Regions:
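Glycosyltransferase catalytic domains, chiefly GT-A lineage
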Residues: 1-276
Length: 276
């Protein structure tokens, strides 16, 4: 049985973290536009020919949607967004998924329960911009007209497990479902959370839905913001050093404790006003 843990990154935007712990028997693969520095624990590969034809956002979506095409000899895959830090051996999580006999493994959304609330939120925070408002409204109206139940599976998609089903009808069904997901992304908004519930409803894939979310405290993942800058790059470098070499843990943890305990509160204190 071959399993791949993989991510896809645009290094001008994404930060890459070295996994804290290895997952024996699971091959960790990183696709990116160039080889990252100061990162260990990933097998780096250049983007595939299909990814190279796309802009960075769509290249990531292609990798996210089509692991069975990218890894034709794999039986299972675990996709993770580049800004997730893998904090533990993922084999127990994989074992849960395999035992469920599901085609795809997903995590419930941490704050919203359906695509209608998600679309309104995306409008409010600018993830769907005014020129796309009508397209977003058309999208959710189309899904409702096509029979998507009012109560449906609604997930956050930064971690996805899949059973590839090589040579089986289930494998062909998974690939067809992912192709439908890609088509929805091309037709409507680029928010894949809005389109996946319809894909799951239409395809009939068997879903393993965990009862916890990877954004909440858990043994397997920690999530960091995408923002980049000199201070963020230094932070990433130190995190990766800490996890790759025990020698770095004491000074880094000591410096971080000093910052949190003394420097950060002092920096945040308002300066007293001068009298007179």
């Amino acid at each position: 049985m071959k399993t791949v843990l993989y991510t896809c990154a645009n290094l001008a935007y994404d930060q890459i973290f070295s996994p804290v712990a290895p997952s024996p028997g699971i091959t960790p693969v990183l696709f990116s536009d160039r080889r990252p520095r100061f990162v260990s624990g990933w097998e780096w590969r250049p983007r595939t020919e299909e990814m190279a034809k796309l802009n960075p956002t769509l290249a990531n979506r292609y990798a996210k949607f089509f692991p069975a095409r990218i890894f034709p000899d794999a039986d299972y895959s675990i996709y993770t967004d580049a800004n997730n830090l893998v904090t533990a051996d993922l084999n127990p999580l994989l074992a849960e998924f395999i035992a469920s006999d599901a085609d795809i493994g997903l995590f419930p959304h941490s704050k919203r329960r359906d695509i209608y609330a998600e679309l309104e939120f995306c409008k409010e925070v600018g993830k769907v911009r005014p020129p796309e408002y009508a397209l977003g409204d058309e999208q959710v109206a189309f899904y409702r007209a096509e029979g998507l139940p009012e109560e449906h599976v609604f997930t956050e998609n930064a971690v996805i497990l899949r059973r590839h089903g090589r040579g089986e009808a289930r494998g062909a069904a998974l690939d067809a479902a992912m192709e439908l997901w890609w088509d929805q992304l091309a037709r409507f908004t680029k928010r894949d959370q809005l389109s996946l519930p319809f894909v799951l409803h239409r395809s009939g894939l068997k879903v393993k839905l965990w009862d916890w979310n990877y954004l909440s405290p858990n043994p397997y993942f920690s999530r960091y913001p995408h923002r980049r800058g000199p201070l963020r790059d230094i932070h990433i470098f130190l995190i990766n050093k800490r996890h790759s070499n025990a020698f770095w843990r004491v000074p880094i943890d000591g410096a971080y404790g000093l910052y949190r305990g003394y420097l950060k509160p002092a920096i945040g204190k308002p300066k007293p006003r001068r009298q007179g």
